Amino acid sequence: TSGEAPDVISLGLEAVNMAVSNDLLVPLDDIITDDEELTAKKDQYAPSLLEGFTVNDSLYGLPNGTQTMVVYYNKHMFDEAGLEYPQDGWTWDQFRETAEKLTKDGVYGFCFPCTYFQLTPWWSTNNAALVGEDGETPTVNSEGIVEAVDFLNGMYKDGICPEPISSDGYTMFANNQVAMVGAGRWVLNTWQDAGLTNDDFDCVQWPVK
């Protein structure tokens, strides 16, 4: 309403705490409570989605979409290796063992590009985060973060994963150069355009520590 800046913006979930701590957002609780349509809209969301936009018991946003990171796997490569398809609830150790068995000449078991969304699930499944609950204190040297980085670095050093900085895991997956890759639903159209179908791949929950 100031005429000088947007009243509504779109933020990634990872930016909410930072925006609140810098006084860039205002709580929406009273606005939503006073509006029947917004109240009905809010009630449609799963509580777990709203938690990501809640800071100090105040709600600062409503999701306009969601992307759940999963592990996509090449079904044909699993079949050729004589491996069962992974199941929800598998562990880091089971994941590494599977990726190692899928690695052969010209094919990597897994690819993890060095992007925030690719790395976050690893420390999230190890009960860790880059910043403390106050949204300000860095925790990059915490045990959970270090353990996750060491785990990934070990797979790279052992040749299970390609070089993470320059590798395009999604293209490599479509070209049968990598057996597993982490992603959300955004990659599906790209793979469809590349000719992949549901017969070629499936997905499973991220492995847990």
Language model segments and positions:
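Short helix-initiation/N-cap motifs at beta->coil->alpha
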Residues: 1, 14, 90-96, 162-175
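Early extracytoplasmic/lumenal segment of secretory-pathway proteins
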Residues: 1-16, 105
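Paired acidic/hydrophobic, glycine-rich loop segments that form the ligand-binding mouth/hinge
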Residues: 7-10, 179-183
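Hinge/lid segment of periplasmic solute-binding proteins
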Residues: 12-68, 96, 202-204
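A ligand-binding cleft/hinge motif common to bilobed small-molecule-binding domains
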Residues: 16-20, 185-198
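Bilobed periplasmic-binding protein-like "clamshell/Venus-flytrap" ligand-binding domains
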Residues: 60-61, 103-114
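Short glycine- and hydrophobic/aromatic-rich loop-to-beta-strand nucleating segment
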Residues: 70-73
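Glycine-centered hinge/linker elements that transmit conformational signals in sensory
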Residues: 98-101, 135-164, 205-206
